[in-house]
């Protein structure tokens, strides 16, 4: 890992902005709910950018038009939690344990436009765990999905 101190909020804004075009197209808005003005973490910038990109990409892919995706940060003790929530199709309970596997796709029949390698969440989990941290998922079919991961807060 190539750890450095950076503001997770700046990174979230940057990643969210990179999806502006597709969000406009699908009429999806991204709402940012930040714990504080600035929130520094000590992590591998490139890997965490990939984590945020993959989670947001999935949230957009599985969300209906005219919906809202929320990215929220929480400052808790030595940790910073980042959650990506959507009101999309949700993940079937039977599939929840498998979503982290490489090349796993929840159900090909659920959408022909759902392009992807099935590597996104495997990469996300590996990146978060490489930091000695965790990622969790809560999902309800037809209601939506929330992914939340922790990172070490930067000292100071």
Language model region names:
Residues 2-7, 24, 29-39:
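Conserved catalytic submotifs in the C-terminal HATPase_c
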Residues 13-25:
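Short alpha-helical segment within the cytosolic histidine kinase core of two-component systems
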Residues 59-60:
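Short helix-loop "hinge" at the ATP-lid/N-box region of the Bergerat-fold HATPase_c
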Residues 66-78:
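Short beta-strand/loop element within the Bergerat-fold HATPase_c
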Residues 86:
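Acidic ATP/Mg2+-coordinating residue in the GHKL
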Residues 91-105:
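Short conserved segment of the HATPase_c
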Residues 132-133:
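Conserved glycine-rich
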């Amino acid at each position: 890992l190539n750890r450095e101190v950076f503001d997770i909020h700046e990174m979230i804004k940057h990643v969210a902005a990179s999806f502006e075009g597709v969000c406009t197209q699908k009429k999806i808005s991204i709402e940012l709910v930040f714990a504080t003005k600035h929130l520094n973490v000590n992590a591998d910038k490139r890997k965490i950018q990939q984590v945020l990109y993959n989670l947001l990409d999935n949230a957009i892919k599985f969300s209906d038009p005219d919906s809202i995706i929320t990215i929220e940060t929480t400052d808790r003790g030595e940790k910073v939690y980042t959650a990506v929530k959507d009101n999309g199709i949700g993940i079937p309970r039977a599939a929840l344990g498998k979503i982290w596997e490489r090349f796993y796709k929840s159900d090909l029949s659920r959408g022909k436009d759902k392009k992807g390698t099935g590597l996104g969440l495997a990469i996300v989990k590996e990146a978060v765990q490489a930091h000695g941290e965790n990622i969790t998922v809560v999902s309800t079919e037809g209601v939506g999905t929330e992914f939340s991961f922790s990172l070490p807060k930067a000292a100071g």
